[in-house]
């Protein structure tokens, strides 16, 4: 293996703290071609689909990639904006908001980059930009509040895959999850209360999380438990009683059993009960995307009302809500403690002088630059 070095490195170069904020990803455009490229990368990840590779290759390339891209492109067309994919647009705002807050609160220099596990901007490009900026310490923050091997685990895999090719590996920290983080839960609760203050309140709050195959739970994945922990703590903050809220799981794919109860079936059952109003929030989605805008606010609304239900209210994801950005910045600050840039005594002038002295010594010993 050839390792990727830094041929343009200069002794005494200033060092900074890097933060890589990541999310799942998005196609480059709402077209079958772009969707095929995106889905191939996504669905070929062994963390996402744990099926023997040879059999899955035949299914993926022989069936799914010949059918699903056209169907998915039509769905993406419905949520695409003039700025682009909602997930990417919101992700940029989130990264900018976190960067602003960290610059105000960290004693030392920091740079925040956004990256996607699948598609662009890639994790590799994000890490490269941080390295080029002088980041010798990097915190990776996947915006998945609840950990699953298929999301956070896959992100760690890709970060490792990139860094294993670097000659000079940076200091690295990784936020596995934040499902019980007080700032995150408080931001969620406040967003629900704010929505209720403006639009009134239904008799039941449905908390829909992205689903995963049940066999992942049985194999030891903590995702199911963490979703329920988030749901319970959110309900407590909202003062909800038993029967006034329910946790469900959406977006199942294929014929295998996934985590239950299923969102669409629960929504249909509540509609058949002639529920007058249903409120839905998706605590596991840090930003609105296809799964919340089209699947929940669109498809599940139709299911509920077609079954006989009344009003259907989707409460938006936290997105770039200031409380959310504050919570994410706090999360970063706690996880970078002990690094120089987080030291209250950080002295930029002293560090620059030390760097210049180090450079002078290196040049004196024969270094070329």
Curated annotation (Swiss-Prot):
Family, per entry: Belongs to the ferrochelatase family.
**Quick check: keyword tRNA processing in the entry?**
no
Residue positions annotated to bind Fe cation are: 210, 291
InterPro entries for the chain: Ferrochelatase, Ferrochelatase_AS, Ferrochelatase_C, Ferrochelatase_N
Any one Gene Ontology biological process term? heme biosynthetic process
What is the protein's given name? Answer: Ferrochelatase
Q: What is the role of this chain? A: Catalyzes the ferrous insertion into protoporphyrin IX.
Q: Which domain of life is it from?
A: Bacteria
Q: Where does it mainly reside? A: cytoplasm
A Gene Ontology molecular function term for this protein is: metal ion binding
Q: Which UniProt keywords apply?
A: Cytoplasm, Heme biosynthesis, Iron, Lyase, Metal-binding, Porphyrin biosynthesis
Q: Name one GO cellular component term.
A: cytoplasm
* Location(s) in or outside the cell: Cytoplasm
Pathway it works in: Porphyrin-containing compound metabolism; protoheme biosynthesis; protoheme from protoporphyrin-IX: step 1/1
The chemistry this enzyme catalyses reads: heme b + 2 H(+) = protoporphyrin IX + Fe(2+)
PROSITE patterns, A to Z: FERROCHELATASE
- EC number(s): the record gives 4.98.1.1
Quote the Pfam families the UniProt record gives.
Answer: Ferrochelatase
Among NCBIfam families, the record links this protein to:
hemH
């Amino acid at each position: 293996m050839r390792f990727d070095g830094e041929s343009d490195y200069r002794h005494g170069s200033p060092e900074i703290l890097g933060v890589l904020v990541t999310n799942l990803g998005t196609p480059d455009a709402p077209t079958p071609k772009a969707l095929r490229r995106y889905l191939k990368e996504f669905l070929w990840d062994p963390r996402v689909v744990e099926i023997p590779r040879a059999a899955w290759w035949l299914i993926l390339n022989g069936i799914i990639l010949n059918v699903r891209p056209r169907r998915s492109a039509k769905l993406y067309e419905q949520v695409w904006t003039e700025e682009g994919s909602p997930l990417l647009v919101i992700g940029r705002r989130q990264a900018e908001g976190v960067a602003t807050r960290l610059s105000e609160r960290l004693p030392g220099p920091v740079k925040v980059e956004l990256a996607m596990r699948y598609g662009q901007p890639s994790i590799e490009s994000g890490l490269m930009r941080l390295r080029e900026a002088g980041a010798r310490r990097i915190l990776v923050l996947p915006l998945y509040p609840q950990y699953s091997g298929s999301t956070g685990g896959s992100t760690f895999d890709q970060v490792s895959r990139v860094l294993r090719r670097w000659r000079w590996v940076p200091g690295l920290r990784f936020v596995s999850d934040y499902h019980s983080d007080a700032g995150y839960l408080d931001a969620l609760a406040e967003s629900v209360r704010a929505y209720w203050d403006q639009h009134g309140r239904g008799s039941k709050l449905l908390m829909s999380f992205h689903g995963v195959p049940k066999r992942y739970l049985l194999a030891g994945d903590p995702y199911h438990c963490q979703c329920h922990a988030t749901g319970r703590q959110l309900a407590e903050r909202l003062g909800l009683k038993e029967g006034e809220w329910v946790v469900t799981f959406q977006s199942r794919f294929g014929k295998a059993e996934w985590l239950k109860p299923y969102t669409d079936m629960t929504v249909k059952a509540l509609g058949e009960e002639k529920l007058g109003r249903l409120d839905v929030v998706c605590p596991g989605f840090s930003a609105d995307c296809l799964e919340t805008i089209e699947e929940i606010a669109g498809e599940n609304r139709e299911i509920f009302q077609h079954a006989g239900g009344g009003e259907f209210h989707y409460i938006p994801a936290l997105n770039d809500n200031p409380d959310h950005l504050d919570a994410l910045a706090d999360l970063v600050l706690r996880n970078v403690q002990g690094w120089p840039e987080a030291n209250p005594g950080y002295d930029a002038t002293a560090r620059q002088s030390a760097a210049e002295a180090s450079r002078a010594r290196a040049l004196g010993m024969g270094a070329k630059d």
